[in-house]
Regions:
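Mid-to-C-terminal alpha-helical segments outside catalytic/metal-binding sites
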Residues: 138-140, 149, 153-185
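Short aromatic-enriched loop/helix-cap "lid" or pocket-rim segments at secondary-structure transitions
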Residues: 20-21, 103-105, 129-130, 154-156, ...
Length: 185
């Protein structure tokens, strides 16, 4: 189960040479770190850059989640990356953000069962996020709030206000992510 004292290891590809597998082992030995977070657009290094390979391989080996900031067409490389690493859990943060990004995220999730969609910033697209629930397995939908940059009450209120039965929303709030964490090795 996700605990408040757990966080993602933020992998910056500009330091890929220094972040060896041994360094990752040292970090992930501590239960504080539960997966990776990547922000390709912040670092101006696209996800298909080979400097991310260590993340894909390490997450595959240890069945870790990888939360990626995705916006617009930014997630396109996962069309080929995700199938190569079936035990890694690729979480498309913001479900692509824009309308085009949301459509691409859904398309990618339909192609690869290890791609998950994150609710955070659902207000950035005119395409209703709840409609995803009818198109992919709900166990691959995750609630996220971007705690800090976004108002968590607003994000949660928007999520709970969707015209979806509570019994279908509840697992998205925590159970689905808890299942991902339970699979780590």
């Amino acid at each position: 189960m996700w605990q408040p004292e757990q966080r993602y290891f933020v992998f910056n590809p500009h330091y890929a040479d220094e972040i060896t597998e041994e360094v990752l082992d040292d970090f992930f030995r501590d239960p504080f770190f539960v997966g990776f977070k990547l922000l390709a657009s912040y670092w101006l290094v696209p996800y298909d850059d080979p400097r991310y390979t260590r993340v894909w391989e390490y997450a595959e080996k240890h069945r870790l989640p990888i939360l990626m900031h995705t916006w617009g067409r930014e997630a396109e490389p996962f069309r080929t990356i995700a199938p190569k690493y079936p035990h890694a859990k690729f979480i498309l943060g913001h479900t692509g953000g824009s309308d085009a990004g949301r459509q691409l995220s859904l398309e990618l999730a339909l192609l690869a069962p290890n791609i998950y969609l994150d609710y955070c910033a659902a207000f950035c697209s005119t395409l209703p996020w709840y409609q995803l629930a009818g198109k992919i397995d709900r166990s691959r939908l995750l609630f996220g709030s971007d705690a800090g940059p976004h108002n968590e009450a607003y994000e949660l209120g928007g999520f709970l206000s969707m015209p979806v039965p509570d019994a279908e929303l509840a697992p998205i709030l925590a159970e689905n992510f808890d299942r991902i964490l339970a699979e780590r090795i």
